[in-house]
């Protein structure tokens, strides 16, 4: 770690957490000359007062002092951050940026860089249903949904690509007045009329474009930005994520007949505020800038949202102190009681690629659902095999051919077999009727134009290839896919889901939690060519993130005084370590294995259990100060971030003592002792006993082994954990757990330990 705040807030660009494409060539070149102005974010820390006009005036004055001209200062200023924190975005040359960074009130100057780009059954699967399910007896009229009136008083802020407001998922039927605390607004714009398109469901709609335009010549060039100059969603991503988090009930929805059911969000009566920061740039899934993101966070803090759902992130961590969706802006939101839920990224299954790793973010991994779309393949010898697809018929009956890497095969009118193709467009226009694609298992299904793609694994693919090579005139029949819910489909951590350990702060476990994020059905923009009646199946941690955001909205309704850290603790300590049906959860990858904390954090989110966790590992500003101090940040910088004088203790606090609902020891030499503090949020008189599952070769001891809560005044207790290794050589990570149980509540935290032997 670097011992300076500048590295702490090193924020690169922001990209939708979907799938990667190429770089952004139309933006200002990295090697621009000093005379070229670019966007820089000048961060000044916590606000010193509550008058936003005074902040804007002071930002103008600082720029005027730098540029020696009122007009130049006015023209330079892009955004003034004035609600959640103090700072501004401005067009500056590199020398001007360097000069202003030396101002005594400036904490850091951050370049507004942009990089390349890298959701129906979900709620039944998680036991969060209006009707009881086989997995959760508590999902009834007394369940979390009903206890919170489905989140009717919660406000979910969605920072994304905007909203398609006409979608039925944003109807406000049966909703009461907008919560009185709401201070936001709807902004009209291109094909978006605030008076028509906003209602008691969609209560906020804003868009942020200045940061992007400043990087692209200052004009809204429609040959580059093919989007609406408003909150209207041209991509569909924001509409999809908003649906998952808080969409209203829409019955009898399907994707070409598949996955039929009722679409709704996790908090179906919650209010939605949409903050559009990502734009449809030609050749990309969506482009967003840090400057626009900061302003959206700033406004959301002012608007008083309860949770921010952010399916956005930077790339794989490199050398930055924090590779985060927005480290500083998110910190200020959390400090003001807003839970920020962020996508962990889609760079799995390799290790150490988790993004959005700040300790105050709730970082989400993605799992599959217990749902599949089996597709019957019948070979000409009457052998029947099963694959998966989104093919909905009618039945295909053709000759069958193998397409090798040279593609030197007559494929017209045939079904072809391919292995590991990543270029489906390569067979377009060649008259192919269907494609059977053999690949490693990842549960990712797709439709490619009008050609049906049938997905299978290598074993079945090899079986089909053997049939082709031993048959004079091979043929195949492909039946329409069907929808299968429940067993035998297993819950798995998705292959694409980014994994820990946390390469930025190894002692901070990331991801925190996992949720369904594969083939999630939700509303999209009808402009999406793959949409069916305004709905689509998307995959990514972009989809698992709003699942958790919707659950947080319900928890906030039930426990309005809980902090964001308490919310996270409730999710982590009550999560499923097996699937809801009791089967093991595996992690997809080159070698399928049982999932561990680096795959899914605490486990698969369990909404009803999280409502009554018993104990929580709470955190506040003091814990975040300890985090910064333990990483070596100087007192003056921390003081400016917090807006009050702060002094780190001597010796500096241990990062192992940060009160997380997890224990991660990345370099255990012999033994170490750490502390945790729990807050009783259950019955006043409770007794909890420790149950330890030590990692292999590690001895864990807890002191005390019993926690006795006997009064309202005694709700907070601290305990210590000693970890001692018996390994004689450097080891990889081994995993265990620590559970506090009172016979009703099992409060479980994951333990991850790696032994490091000094040379």
UniProtKB/Swiss-Prot annotation:
InterPro entries hit by this protein: Peptidase_S8/S53_dom, Peptidase_S8/S53_dom_sf, Peptidase_S8_Ser-AS, Peptidase_S8_subtilisin-rel, Peptidases_S8_3, S8pro/Inhibitor_I9, S8pro/Inhibitor_I9_sf, SBT
Protein name, as recorded: Subtilisin-like protease SBT3.14
Propeptide residue range(s): 26-118
CDD domains, alphabetized: PA_subtilisin_like (cd02120), Peptidases_S8_3 (cd04852)
Gene: SBT3.14
Enzyme Commission number: 3.4.21.-
The entry's keywords: Autocatalytic cleavage, Glycoprotein, Hydrolase, Protease, Secreted, Serine protease, Signal, Zymogen
Cellular location(s): Secreted
Start and end residues of each Inhibitor I9 domain: 39-117
Record domain Peptidase S8: where: 122-611
């Amino acid at each position: 770690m670097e011992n300076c705040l500048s590295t702490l807030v090193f924020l690169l660009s922001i990209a939708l957490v979907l799938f990667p494409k190429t770089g952004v060539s139309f933006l200002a070149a990295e090697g621009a000359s000093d005379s070229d102005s670019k966007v820089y974010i000048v961060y000044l820390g916590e606000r010193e007062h509550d008058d936003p006009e005074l902040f804007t005036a002071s930002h103008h004055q600082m720029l005027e002092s730098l540029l020696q001209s009122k007009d130049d200062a006015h023209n330079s200023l892009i955004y003034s951050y004035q609600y959640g924190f103090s700072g501004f975005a401005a067009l500056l040359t590199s020398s001007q940026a360097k000069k202003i960074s030396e101002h005594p009130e400036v904490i850091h100057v951050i370049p507004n860089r942009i990089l390349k780009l890298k959701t129906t059954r979900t709620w039944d699967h998680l036991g969060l249903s209006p009707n009881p399910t086989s997995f959760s007896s508590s999902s009834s009229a007394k369940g979390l949904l009903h206890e919170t009136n489905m989140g009717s008083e919660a406000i979910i802020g969605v920072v994304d690509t905007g909203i398609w407001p006409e979608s039925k998922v944003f109807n406000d039927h049966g909703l009461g007045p907008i919560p009185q605390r709401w201070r936001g607004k709807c902004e009209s714009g291109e094909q978006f009329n605030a008076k028509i398109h906003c209602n008691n469901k969609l209560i906020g709609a804003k868009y942020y474009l200045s940061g992007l335009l400043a990087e692209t010549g200052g004009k809204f060039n429609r040959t580059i930005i093919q989007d609406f100059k408003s909150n209207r969603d041209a991509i569909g991503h924001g509409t999809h994520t908003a649906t998952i988090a808080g969409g209203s009930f829409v019955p009898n929805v399907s994707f070409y007949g598949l996955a039929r059911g009722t679409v709704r969000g996790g908090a179906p009566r919650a209010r939605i505020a949409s903050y559009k920061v990502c734009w449809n740039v030609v050749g990309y899934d969506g482009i967003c800038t840090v400057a626009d993101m900061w302003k959206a966070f700033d406004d959301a803090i002012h608007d008083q949202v309860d949770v921010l759902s952010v399916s956005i992130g930077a790339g794989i961590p490199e050398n930055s102190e924090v590779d985060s969706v927005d480290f500083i802006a998110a910190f200020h939101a959390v400090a003001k009681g807003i839970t920020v839920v962020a996508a962990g990224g889609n760079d799995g299954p390799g290790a150490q690629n988790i993004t959005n790793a700040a300790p105050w973010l709730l970082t989400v991994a993605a799992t599959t659902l217990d749902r599949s779309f089996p597709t019957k393949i019948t070979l000409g010898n009457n052998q029947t095999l099963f694959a998966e697809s989104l093919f909905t018929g009618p039945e295909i009956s053709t000759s069958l051919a193998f397409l090798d890497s040279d593609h030197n095969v007559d494929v017209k009118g045939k079904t072809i077999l391919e292995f590991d193709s990543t270029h489906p467009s390569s067979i377009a226009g060649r008259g192919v009727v269907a494609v059977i694609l053999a690949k490693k298992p990842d549960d990712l299904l797709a439709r490619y134009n009008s050609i049906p793609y049938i997905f299978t694994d290598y074993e079945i693919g090899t079986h089909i290839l053997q049939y082709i090579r031993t048959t004079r005139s091979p043929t195949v029949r492909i039946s329409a896919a069907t929808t299968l819910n429940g067993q035998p489909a297993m819950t798995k951590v998705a292959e694409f889901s980014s994994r820990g350990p946390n390469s930025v702060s190894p002692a901070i476990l990331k991801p925190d939690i996992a949720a369904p994020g594969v083939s999630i059905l939700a509303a999209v923009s009808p402009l999406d060519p793959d949409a069916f009646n305004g709905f689509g199946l998307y995959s990514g941690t972009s989809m698992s993130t709003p699942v958790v955001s919707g659950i947080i909205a319900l928890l906030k309704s039930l426990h309005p005084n809980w902090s964001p850290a308490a919310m996270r603790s409730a999710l982590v300590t009550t999560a499923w370590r097996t699937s809801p049906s009791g089967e093991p959860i595996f992690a997809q990858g080159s070698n399928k294995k049982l999932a561990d904390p680096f795959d899914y954090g605490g486990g698969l989110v369990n909404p009803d259990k999280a409502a009554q966790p018993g104990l929580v590992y709470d955190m506040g500003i003091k814990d975040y100060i300890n985090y910064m101090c333990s990483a070596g940040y100087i007192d003056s910088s921390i003081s400016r971030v917090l807006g009050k004088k702060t002094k780190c203790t001597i010796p500096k606090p241990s990062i192992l003592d940060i009160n997380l609902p997890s224990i991660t020891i990345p370099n255990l030499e012999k033994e170490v002792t750490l502390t945790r503090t729990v807050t009783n949020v259950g019955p006043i008189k409770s007794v909890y006993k420790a149950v330890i599952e030590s990692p292999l070769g590690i001895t864990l001891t807890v002191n005390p082994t019993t926690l006795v809560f006997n009064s309202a005044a005694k709700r907070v207790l601290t305990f210590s954990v000693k970890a001692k290794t018996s390994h004689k050589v450097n080891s990889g990570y081994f995993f265990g757990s620590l559970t506090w149980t009172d016979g009703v509540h099992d409060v479980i935290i994951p333990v991850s330990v790696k032994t490091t032997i000094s040379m």
